[in-house]
A protein has these predicted regions:
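Conserved beta-strand positions in repeat-built beta-propeller and related beta-rich domains
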Residues: 32, 48-53, 89-94, 130-135, ...
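Short loop/turn segments that connect beta-strands within beta-propeller blades
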Residues: 60-64, 101-105, 142-146, 183-187, ...
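Blade-level signature of beta-propeller repeat domains, shared across WD40, Kelch, NHL, RCC1
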Residues: 199-231
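Intrinsically disordered, low-complexity N-terminal segments that are enriched in acidic
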Residues: 225-323
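Acidic low-complexity segments
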Residues: 307-406
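Hydrophobic/aromatic-rich core segments of domains that either
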Residues: 414-507
């Protein structure tokens, strides 16, 4: 019976590992000390520093048992890294980098860190890297004399753990509770994972998994970072959304015809409908546009002043924050993009002007000889952030891409037009999605709306790219505009632009004709209400 039970446990363990996705924790080891900081992997064993005990532990990752330990050379031990022969260690109080004999713990070399507040170390096969929490930077330095070779901004305000996986750096940020993938050549944050614990500290890479030690939980986590399943869901909410398109004729003339088109939300990764879409008025018909978007068509005739119509719909939905982790080297080439996707999402449009010499020249200038779809889109994304600033009407609105890129300001719609134009000009399929957004509280009204791009990256499919959201100073903030959708949207529209119903718009489209002079007004808005029990703020009872 015991053998059967043990076999069942083994089978369940193997099954869980097989179904683990990117970001999943596949193993947890209890730290041997109360204040774990730095972490390293030597090809067989983990090494862990503890800042209260002033010790470095050698740990068997298979069993979690301590193999040996020795005292640290200083009294504020933090970062660790293995260079293939020696253990390097950083002391944040002394601000020194030590090269240690892994057998005895003896100091073989001590270097000035050239950092105000060093925290962790990485080794790229030639040079050392370290995080400087006070200056919010990542520093590359010489293992010979400690002198700085390169420096760039850290992902956020609290850089902690650091590791090199053979191509990219990994950096934890304790304020953002994230682990960022960073390009050491540019300093760009490429993607990120939410940390499993609340205080992500040291990092180590074992060739397949990333190890992260959590300073608050006193645990070591083995994290899966390579898998075909790159999506995770977070922050579930259940809400009801009511979308209304209001049209008024104040006269004195007659509105002879009015056609309103309302695209309908459907199940997507970030949203699951809890029931059918319900209409405030019965539509004249249901139609599907050239992009496959389903929508309701409302038709009105001879609206005499004063007249008002308010077609719309409501839906109950479960919405999520959705995150896709993109490791650039695992993205396929342009030749791996399906032909039907290319045929549909590489076409020109009035807002894109793909054949404009300005668009063609700028696209080539930005991308150079790059062939990886991720890097093409990412370079364009960074260009838009560096050269555009957010500005709505009267300066901006829905101008075509060449106008926007020359002007240097953009609405969210114009960010999307510009990214679509430059990506399509280089053979990367791009489209946009339109949404109704929560504005602050879950009971709120949205009359501004929002849209962003989706870029086709093989083999994963459509990945969100929101250059408007990513237009911030911190590298980590920029990364959150790619592959991340917050739990505050219902996506109504999935479109390539230029169809006869929505044109290059989203959430609604409308046309009207009139006889005589007519003063008309129109507005669109989404009303949100949370589902479930009411919420109250109550003080704690006195004991």
């Amino acid at each position: 019976m015991k053998k059967v039970f043990l076999m069942l446990i083994v089978v369940l363990l193997l099954f869980s590992l097989a179904w683990a996705r990117v970001g999943d924790v596949v193993k947890v080891i209890k730290a041997p000390g109360p204040c774990p900081t730095g972490l390293a992997f030597d090809g067989r064993y983990l090494w862990l520093a503890d800042s209260r005990l002033d010790k470095i532990f050698k740990i068997d990752p298979a069993s979690g048992q301590v193999v040996k330990s020795f005292d640290t050379p200083g009294y504020h031990p933090e970062g660790l890294v293995w260079d293939g022969k020696y253990l390097w260690h950083i002391d944040s109080g002394e601000r020194l980098v030590y090269c240690l004999d892994p057998e005895t713990g003896a100091v073989l070399k001590a270097l000035e860190s050239n950092s105000d507040r060093p925290r962790d170390l990485a080794w790229d096969g030639q040079d050392l890297w370290l995080t400087d929490v006070r200056n919010k930077t990542i520093i590359r330095c010489s293992p010979v004399d400690g002198m700085m070779i390169q420096q760039f901004s850290a992902p956020g305000a609290e850089p902690a753990g650091l590791e090199f996986d053979g191509k990219y750096l990994w950096v934890t940020d304790r304020a953002m509770d994230r682990i960022f993938l960073v390009d050491p050549a540019t300093g760009w944050c490429l993607s990120s994972l939410r940390s499993y614990g609340p205080w992500p500290a040291g990092l180590a890479f074992d060739g397949q998994h990333l190890w992260n030690v959590d300073y608050e939980n006193d645990e070591l986590y083995q994290v899966k970072v390579f898998d075909s399943d790159i999506m995770t869901l977070w922050d579930e909410k259940e809400l009801e959304l009511r979308l209304v398109k209001e049209f008024r004729n104040y006269g004195p003339g007659l509105v002879t015809s009015l056609d309103i088109y309302l695209p309908l939300p459907a199940d997507r990764d970030n949203q699951k409908l809890l029931g059918p879409v319900e209409f405030l008025q019965k539509p004249a018909e249901m139609i599907t546009d050239a992009w496959g978007q389903k929508m309701a068509h409302f038709n009105y005739r001879n609206l005499k002043a004063p007249a008002v119509v308010q077609p719309g719909w409501s839906v109950k939905a479960r919405i999520y924050a959705v995150e896709y982790f993109i490791y650039p080297d695992r993205v396929g080439g342009l030749d791996q993009i399906p032909e039907d996707i290319k045929k549909k999402y590489l076409v020109d449009g009035d807002k894109y002007c793909l054949n404009d010499p300005f668009i063609q020249g700028l696209a080539r200038k930005i991308a150079g000889n790059e062939k990886n779809p991720y890097w093409i889109a990412r370079k364009i994304y960074e260009y838009l952030i560096d050269h555009l600033s957010y500005n709505l009407k009267p300066v901006g609105g829905w101008n075509p891409a060449p106008t926007v890129l020359r002007r240097g300001t953009a609405s969210c719609s114009e960010y999307t037009y510009s990214l679509i134009a430059l990506c399509r000009a280089l053979g990367v399929p791009a489209r946009y999605v339109g949404t109704v957004s929560l504005r602050g509280d879950e009971a709120s009204l949205d009359d501004v709306f929002h849209r962003w791009n989706e870029i086709y990256l093989p083999p994963y499919g459509w990945i969100p790219f929101d250059a408007n959201k990513g237009d911030v100073e911190t590298p980590g903030g920029r990364a959150l505009g790619i592959g991340n959708v917050a739990a505050r949207y219902v996506i109504t529209t999935e479109n390539g632009g230029g169809d006869k119903y929505l044109w290059f718009g989203y959430n609604y489209g409308f046309t009207w004709t009139a006889e005589g002079k007519c003063r008309v007004s129109e507005e669109s808005y989404g009303e949100w209400q949370p589902l479930g029990p009411k919420k109250y703020q109550k003080p704690l009872p006195r004991k």
